[in-house]
């Protein structure tokens, strides 16, 4: 269990579930923690499906934006890219109709409340589901489509199933390639990851922002000890690369740096 937990970056209960699933063992959940986690995973899964359908079933600003960025349909599907429309509460209505309690929707950061009214946290944004190595949707990133909307990127808050410092975007897709290539390419963001993946460079992950953490370094070390840092070439990216290099070196990893333009 400990090996599965560490190798797949899972909580104890999730490691047990994964082993049970692989070996065809039926589990009877203890009341409390296990059930609580499962509802978060289910909420995120259904939200991801809702966003994906909005992105794929009819013309929308999100799909047009990604098309302008040159991302091919098969890559969009691979990463489960979605679209949060401009409605104030379409996701809220969808999920509450499925019977999910509002307090859980607020906890995972999909819904906010103001003066007794509930509204969607992500609106008019391209949605990037964050998926762990067990295939569970644990959070989301949302990229503003309108240049006047701030912040440019909106991410899920910390929750019982999402700890930003413990996860790497795209690792669910890239870990086999990392093992094959013998090294990992670490970039800043969602679009960096997707663009490189589309170009055939599939041993790539993102640190979910500019600040690499020690836990993320430990996670990388489970798969390889050779890291190529490819952060943006602006001042923030350079500073982050230097901080990241120090963290990785202190963890016993070999680090190379290459510069990319963009953001």
Describe the predicted segments one by one.
Residues 71, 100, 201, 252-253:
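Short phosphate-binding/catalytic loops that engage adenosine nucleotides
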Residues 1-103, 107, 125, 156:
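Non-catalytic accessory segments of DNA primases and related replication-initiation nucleases
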Residues 33-35, 39, 44-46, 87-227, ...:
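Phosphate-handling DNA/RNA-contact segment within nucleic-acid enzymes
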Residues 7-8, 19, 141, 208, ...:
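Glycine-rich, histidine-containing beta strand-loop boundary motifs that form or position
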Residues 9, 21, 25, 202, ...:
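Short, well-ordered loop/turn and helix-capping segments at boundaries between secondary-structure elements
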Residues 7, 83-86, 191, 211-212, ...:
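Short beta->alpha linker loops
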Residues 252-263:
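C-terminal or mid-to-C-terminal helical accessory/interaction module adjacent to the motor/catalytic core
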